[in-house]
């Protein structure tokens, strides 16, 4: 072939290849642009659907926790949670707390707790054995998680508190201020809705466990007056965070502190602490109109600490070893009662659950079930009740549950701080096991040395 023709032929082929390549690139660009336009259009069209779904879910999420069901029949207690807060706090950022308690909505269970405005293993943890200070706040986190700045929600300023969910929003009751004039601040959905002023000017205090909600109304019990003598006790009925009714108990020779309350068949039962002169626990039950009955658990299986050895009980205050006490709970089933108590009779150590089939009304000390929760060689502390409503569990009854505070540090151990972790159990009508679920932290910490 002529050299010039060869050059022309090769040039023509290269030009054709270049034109084809250019057309392919233009086609690719057009394809990408069309595809992007379609995706953008679909995205904009999907947004109203997404928002509609979100709003629908929010609407469905609001219910009324009726509280009209009876407590579920149970044969024992299944482990529900353990937060290991002190163990984790030796290395991680965990709050110094006390008075933890659990409450459940129809969607979730949360651990509420009173912080000391300090973290474990930090200088501000020094001296945190004090109950009432302006630094204490009520916070909450998902149940079973160690309470830290990263997973906790601020609720209110408080050194005594309660909280519960009515099916629409959380209600918090938070007491703070001076001993001679404290005020309880009520918040509903995080907004201040009402206040309650100390009426005896002597350390207004409340449950340190969940309030009880029935048919959209929530109920709590408060105490004002001496911790070692006759005080004043009131039941409050609240709706959407506002007090709509209250009644003062006519209860001479009774002492009610730190009540553990739960709904049962449309009414509320509270089992409390007698810090004056009872080693058995006082109770108050009331309907939605605040018509009430009062008494003491009659069983010879005594529930407070300190307490005498089990023996013959009393349907009034059992005065032997009756002074002082610890927050606790029981669940009434007809004439029978599940009693939660420390294993030790004179220190806050160990924990057990006992079923006394005649203990609500009978004074003998016979029981048929004992389930170990914490060994007597390990520290316990406060304990209290909470429930899971049918709207959460899908059951046709209210599930009884309880939590146990596992106190560590001062005054029993060589630390500069006092704090605790917690465990919880729920009642089931199936197989359970007794064991020991202690706090398990190795003390002292670095800050203590």
UniProtKB/Swiss-Prot annotation:
Its EC number is 3.2.1.18. Substrate binds at residues 98, 132, 257-258, 273, 348. The chain crosses the membrane at residues 7-27. Inhibited by the neuraminidase inhibitors zanamivir (Relenza) and oseltamivir (Tamiflu). These drugs interfere with the release of progeny virus from infected cells and are effective against all influenza strains. Resistance to neuraminidase inhibitors is quite rare. Residues 11-33 are annotated as: Involved in apical transport and lipid raft association. Residues 28-449 are virion surface. Belongs to the glycosyl hydrolase 34 family. It comes from Influenza A virus (strain A/Chicken/Hong Kong/37.4/2002 H5N1 genotype X2). The keyword Ribosomal protein does not apply. Keywords: Calcium, Disulfide bond, Glycoprotein, Glycosidase, Host cell membrane, Host membrane, Hydrolase, Membrane, Metal-binding, Signal-anchor, Transmembrane, Transmembrane helix, Virion. It holds the Pfam family Neur. Residues 36-70 are annotated as: Hypervariable stalk region. The active site is at 131 (proton donor/acceptor), 382 (nucleophile). It is a single-pass type II membrane protein. This is Neuraminidase. Catalyzes the removal of terminal sialic acid residues from viral and cellular glycoconjugates. Cleaves off the terminal sialic acids on the glycosylated HA during virus budding to facilitate virus release. Additionally helps virus spread through the circulation by further removing sialic acids from the cell surface. These cleavages prevent self-aggregation and ensure the efficient spread of the progeny virus from cell to cell. Otherwise, infection would be limited to one round of replication.
